[in-house]
């Protein structure tokens, strides 16, 4: 019986995942929720300062086998930005990081007397040479660096696990399929020099079936990075060319794609660049074509030629088609009905819809924290399996309410602080809040809900949510423009009573995590216009009473009033900020955005006029 901490630290989405096998307890949180810098990849020390219990562990597990020396560059630049500029949110952080990347001399000169600067100078000078000629040395030195860093923090030896295996383990052991034989598919940008893997899991045994390599295309002297073949990276590159933030705004590319049509010539280039080897079950690459496709000037010309919407539609359609083609080949080989999935690309809900509709798999599971936010969970699980621990109980934890919670007393203490007295009013309404909230939504109000444990993963599922009426066609534009302050074309997702699923949607299944889209029946398009995208799809959370009793009551009351057990549900945060964690976060974001009321652990909060 042991306590294990999975730790993701480096590049983006750092965080921890705690498993206590004796008490059957888990806890997961990302660094971004503490620092409020979205996709924060820095040290997990801010988490440990907030939750010191996480230091009381037996083992530490890390979700990479190969962490190269770039870790040193990232760590010190990240520390420097946070120490020097103290950025509040991701926009400020990204601004300073861009400045430093364009002026490395400034960074070096400002830190010349600090002991770590000699590490920086050594890596800057040797990274290209080491990487090209002595890649193994570059990776081994990186592994030593990350182990040294984590051992300094936790005073424990660190176990390293292959990145895609960590994705796969999280998807299988939290799925309802355990202990049955299951195919597990992962797809992301890069992890341990792969971007895709296919596994066979059965109980505590697993084997790697195939993987696709991150084949090096070229070295970018301007950005100081190696570019490689990767389905996730090419999608992120299209996202960047569209003017969005790569590794963050891919959902915007996906949303914009619904307004365009794929360009045949560009689509065919992508198809020729990434070819499926049917025997080896992997993607292989035409490097000459990929050199073109990874040239930003070349892609910029394509975008200008065909327009933003068609540019987005091309990469989206190609993604859907190539993944569906691959998985159909996999199914024909194995004839296994169960498919579990994880990896950053698996956040693409329209791709997942295509897998559901266009492949023969009968059972599909997508891990709620499908991106690198979830690999800490996979690493902790793999350590438990290695130690022979029973983790069969994980599959019973359907809803990812695995983060911190704050009591009514904590909330009351925060509400009473002097800094809020001129900004908000509040009253305690107790357990009747779900019904009052439903009544307010039905009258056209936009409300926020803060209750219970915070969600683990990118989706708010009723505990840190902003809710609104899907019947009003103006709801989406209102939230986009005055509440979330996002682009006009981004859709919002609905939370739906499970008993309403077959009434409102075409072919679907009991999915609870907003990780796949389904098609709304056409007779409801004009009745629930803000619950779906322009193409008639919606990314729903189907809610049962056992999942979240208070949220279920809210939906039931809304159906009683309106005839529809469905509300718009978007995460409780402003655009560019992270989902709120503490009562202080909740009050701050409530004041800063145009929400009519907030329900927080039995309190009804409103802004002073």
Curated annotation (Swiss-Prot):
GO terms for molecular function: transferase activity. Pfam families: Carbam_trans_C, Carbam_trans_N. Keywords: Transferase. GO terms for biological process: biosynthetic process. Signal peptide: none annotated. The keyword Transferase applies. Belongs to the NodU/CmcH family. This is Uncharacterized protein MJ1058.
């Amino acid at each position: 019986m042991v306590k294990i901490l999975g730790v993701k630290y480096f590049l983006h989405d750092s965080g921890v995942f705690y498993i206590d096998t004796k008490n059957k307890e888990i806890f997961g949180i990302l660094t971004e929720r503490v620092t409020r810098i979205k996709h924060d990849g820095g040290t997990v020390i801010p988490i440990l300062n907030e939750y010191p219990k996480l230091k009381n562990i037996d083992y530490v597990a890390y979700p990479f086998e190969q962490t190269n020396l770039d870790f040193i560059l990232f760590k010190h630049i990240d520390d420097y930005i946070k120490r020097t500029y103290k950025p509040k949110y991701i926009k400020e952080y990204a601004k300073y990081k861009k400045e430093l990347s364009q002026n490395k001399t400034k960074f070096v000169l400002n830190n010349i007397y600090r002991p770590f600067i000699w590490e920086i100078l050594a890596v800057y000078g040797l990274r290209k040479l080491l990487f090209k000629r002595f890649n193994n040395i570059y990776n081994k030195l990186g592994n030593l660096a990350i182990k040294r860093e984590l051992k300094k923090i936790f005073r424990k030896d660190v176990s390293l696990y292959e990145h895609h295996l960590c994705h796969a383990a999280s998807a299988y052991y939290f799925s309802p399929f355990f202990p049955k034989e299951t195919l597990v598919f992962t797809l992301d940008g890069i992890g341990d020099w792969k971007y895709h893997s296919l596994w066979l899991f059965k109980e505590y045994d697993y084997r790697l079936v195939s993987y696709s390599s991150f084949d090096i295309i070229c070295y970018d002297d301007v950005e100081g990075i190696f570019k490689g073949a990767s389905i996730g990276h090419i999608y992120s590159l299209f996202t960047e060319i569209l003017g969005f933030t790569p590794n963050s705004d891919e959902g915007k590319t996906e949303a914009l794609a619904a307004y365009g049509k794929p360009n045949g010539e560009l689509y065919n280039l992508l198809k020729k660049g990434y070819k499926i080897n049917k025997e080896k079950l992997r993607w292989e690459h035409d490097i000459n074509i990929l050199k073109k496709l990874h040239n930003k000037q070349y892609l910029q010309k394509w975008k200008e030629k065909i327009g933003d919407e068609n540019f987005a539609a091309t990469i989206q359609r190609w993604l859907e088609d190539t993944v569906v083609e691959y998985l159909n080949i996999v199914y024909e080989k194995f004839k296994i009905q169960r498919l579990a999935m994880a990896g950053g690309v698996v956040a693409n809900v329209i791709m997942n819809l295509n897998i559901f509709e266009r492949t023969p798999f009968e059972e599909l599971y997508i891990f709620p924290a499908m991106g690198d936010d979830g690999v800490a969970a996979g690493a902790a699980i793999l350590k438990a399996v290695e130690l022979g621990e029973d983790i069969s109980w994980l599959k019973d934890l359907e809803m990812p309410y695995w983060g911190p919670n704050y009591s009514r007393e904590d909330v009351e203490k925060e509400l009473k602080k002097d800094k809020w007295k001129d900004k908000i009013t509040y009253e305690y309404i107790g357990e009747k809040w779900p019904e009052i909230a439903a009544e307010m939504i039905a009258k056209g109000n936009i409300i926020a809900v803060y209750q219970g444990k915070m969600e683990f993963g990118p989706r708010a599922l009723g505990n840190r949510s902003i809710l609104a009426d899907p019947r009003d066609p103006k709801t989406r534009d209102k939230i986009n423009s005055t509440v979330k302050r996002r682009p006009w074309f981004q859709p919002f997702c609905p939370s739906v009573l499970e008993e309403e699923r077959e009434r409102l949607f075409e072919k679907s299944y009991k999915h609870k995590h907003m990780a796949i889209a389904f098609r709304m029946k056409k007779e409801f398009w004009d009745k629930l216009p803000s619950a779906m995208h322009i193409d008639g799809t919606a990314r729903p959370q189907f809610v049962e009473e056992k999942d979240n009793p208070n949220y279920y009551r809210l939906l039931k009351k809304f159906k009683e009033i309106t005839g529809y057990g469905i509300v718009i549900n978007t995460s409780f945060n402003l655009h560019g900020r992270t989902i709120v964690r503490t009562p202080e976060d909740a009050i701050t974001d409530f004041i800063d955005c145009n929400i009519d009321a907030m329900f927080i652990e039995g309190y009804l909060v409103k802004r002073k006029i």
